[in-house]
Regions:
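Pepsin/retropepsin-fold aspartyl endopeptidases
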Residues: 1-49, 54-145
C-alpha cells in the first residue's frame, strides 16, 4: 500500500459505542447504533450524556439533569419557550455558567429546562455555534477547529 502526505491527519473512526476521538482542538463523535450522535458534556462540573441536536436552538436539559446540576425551578416558571415538531415546548429558560466538551469550553450558555417529555438532554446551537466547525462525514460528527 502507498501512503500520501496530507496537511492534517484524517479522523479515524473508533467503533466502540459512544467513544469520542480527540484531536488537537476538535472531537470526532461516532454515529451510535440508532443513527444519532451522543456526547459526554460537563455542565458546571457535572457530567451528563447529551444527544447532539443541530436543530435545537439552545441546550435543552431534562428535569433530572438540571436538578443534578443544581438548577432549581418552580412550576410557575414553566412557559412556552420554543415551537417543535409536536407543538409548543414548555420549559424554564436559564443560563449555564460553563459548558465543556473535551477541550471546547463556553461560558454563559443559553439553555432551557424541559420538565416533561424530554428523555435525554440535547446539546443545541447555543453551544454548537461556539465550537467552530460542525461537520458530519464518514468518520462521524466533527466538532471544533
Amino acid at each position: 500500500s502507498s501512503e500520501t502526505a496530507e496537511a492534517a491527519p484524517a479522523p479515524v473512526r473508533i467503533d466502540a459505542a459512544r467513544q469520542a476521538q480527540w484531536n488537537a482542538g476538535q472531537i470526532v463523535l461516532p454515529r451510535a447504533g440508532d443513527g444519532h450522535f451522543y456526547a459526554d458534556v460537563s455542565v458546571d462540573g457535572v457530567s451528563t450524556q447529551m444527544l447532539v441536536d443541530t436543530g435545537a436552538s439552545v441546550i435543552a436539559l431534562t428535569a433530572d439533569d438540571a436538578a443534578n446540576m443544581g438548577y432549581l425551578w418552580d412550576q410557575q416558571d414553566v412557559r412556552a419557550v420554543a415551537h417543535g415538531a409536536g407543538g409548543d415546548v414548555y420549559g424554564v429558560p436559564i443560563t449555564l455558567d460553563r459548558v465543556q466538551l473535551g477541550e471546547i469550553e463556553a461560558h454563559g450558555v443559553r439553555a432551557i429546562i424541559v420538565p416533561e417529555g424530554l428523555e435525554i438532554s440535547l446539546l443545541g446551537q447555543s453551544f454548537l455555534a461556539r465550537v467552530g466547525r460542525v461537520e458530519i462525514d464518514a468518520s462521524g460528527m466533527i466538532l471544533g477547529s
